[in-house]
UniProtKB/Swiss-Prot annotation:
Principal subcellular localisation of the protein: cytoplasm
A cellular component annotation (GO) from this entry: acetyl-CoA carboxylase complex
Pathway in which this enzyme or protein is active: Lipid metabolism; malonyl-CoA biosynthesis; malonyl-CoA from acetyl-CoA: step 1/1
Location of the CoA carboxyltransferase C-terminal domain: 36-286
Function: Component of the acetyl coenzyme A carboxylase (ACC) complex. First, biotin carboxylase catalyzes the carboxylation of biotin on its carrier protein (BCCP) and then the CO(2) group is transferred by the carboxyltransferase to acetyl-CoA to form malonyl-CoA.
Enzyme class name: transferase
Name used for this protein in its record: Acetyl-coenzyme A carboxylase carboxyl transferase subunit alpha
Gene Ontology BP, a term: fatty acid biosynthetic process
The protein's assembly and partners: Acetyl-CoA carboxylase is a heterohexamer composed of biotin carboxyl carrier protein (AccB), biotin carboxylase (AccC) and two subunits each of ACCase subunit alpha (AccA) and ACCase subunit beta (AccD).
Family listed: Belongs to the AccA family.
Keyword tags: ATP-binding, Cytoplasm, Fatty acid biosynthesis, Fatty acid metabolism, Lipid biosynthesis, Lipid metabolism, Nucleotide-binding, Transferase
Enzyme Commission code: 2.1.3.15
Source species: Campylobacter jejuni (strain RM1221)
Gene behind this protein: accA
């Protein structure tokens, strides 16, 4: 059953009316309702607020990494384990073909359904997850296979066990190692880009975001709790933090924004997957014509520009 956000209630009502009309066999009513649905979808998604985009980034029906992997990869084979502690299901790694091009995809997976969410720790990787990602990235470099990173996490797991096993070291190590990989890399924020948990697989030649994704150093709820001692002010925090794809593009923090279907990726996963696949193919064609040493140098320059400021 489809899930609906508060601002999608009109869409939900029309969807239900369509189902009822189909059950009754009223084809004329179905045709009229579908036209009304298209108008309502266009109206609803035309001028979304920052907070509504945050809600869409977290939408329970939004496609996750495994959904995109299934839709865009052919002959996909999963790679498990960090070869040191265990396999972290919050990070998924696959080798396969994007069209005729061999590629490795490394993504953060939140999970669907209670059991899967718990197994994948709600998309919050442990240090062994980031070490698995790094192991696979090194494997990709060894065999000269480009990497696609799919970012979707509320953040790295902050539990005691994760800290004891070196969470901060694992993230820092990934930042260091991924910045110098001698292969083309692309990172796409497909949902939530939560702080260091996102950065740990977000160092790439191209860092891009889906239109209805977000990227921030802390959740708006956390920001509101710290600044105003009131998590309920998360809507104001979302606007103040500039977390949307358009905001980050205007600040030069990301390279591109991938448009989603008019009704959002959660209502048309296939179209969203096509948009990602097309962007990745085009970008890899560009990046593969650049010397790998130049790619590495350019990547480092991008990192050094982050956080620059001018004194008034």
């Amino acid at each position: 059953m489809a899930s609906y956000l508060d601002f999608e209630k009109n869409i939900q009502q029309i969807d239900e009316d369509i189902i009822n009309a189909q059950i009754k066999g009223d084809t004329e009513a179905v045709s009229i309702l579908k036209k009304n649905l298209e108008k309502e979808i266009s109206k609803t998604y035309k001028n979304l607020s920052d907070f509504q985009r945050l809600q869409l980034a977290r939408h329970p029906d939004r496609p996750y990494a495994l959904d995109y992997i299934e839709l865009i990869l052919n002959d996909a084979h999963e790679i498990h384990g960090d070869r040191a502690f265990r396999d972290d299901p919050a990070i998924v790694c696959f080798m396969g073909y994007l069209g005729e091009k061999k590629i490795i995809v490394i993504g953060e997976q939140k999970g669907r359904g209670t059991k899967d969410k718990i197994a994948r720790n709600f998309g919050m990787p442990h240090p062994e997850g980031y070490r698995k990602a790094l192991r696979v990235a090194r494997l990709a470099e060894k065999f000269q296979i480009p990497i696609l990173f799919l970012i979707d996490t509320p953040g790295a797991y902050p539990g005691i066990g994760a800290e004891e096993r070196g969470q901060s070291e694992a993230i820092a190590r990934n930042l260091y190692e991924l910045s110098d990989l001698k292969i083309p890399t692309i990172a796409i924020v497909i949902g939530e880009g939560g702080s260091g948990g996102a950065l740990a697989i977000g160092v790439a030649d191209k860092l891009v975001m889906m239109k209805n994704s977000v990227f921030s150093v802390i959740s708006p709820e956390g920001c509101a709790a710290i600044l105003w001692n009131d998590p309920a002010k998360s809507e104001a925090a979302t606007k103040a933090m500039k977390v949307t794809a358009d905001d980050l593009k205007s600040q030069g923090l990301i390279d591109d924004v991938i448009d989603e279907p008019t009704n959002g990726a959660h209502r048309n996963k296939e179209a969203a997957a096509v948009a990602i696949a097309d962007y990745v193919k085009k970008s890899l064609n560009e990046l593969e014509n650049i010397d790998v040493r130049e790619l590495s140098a350019n990547r480092m320059q991008k990192i050094l520009k982050l956080g620059a400021y001018q004194e008034a």
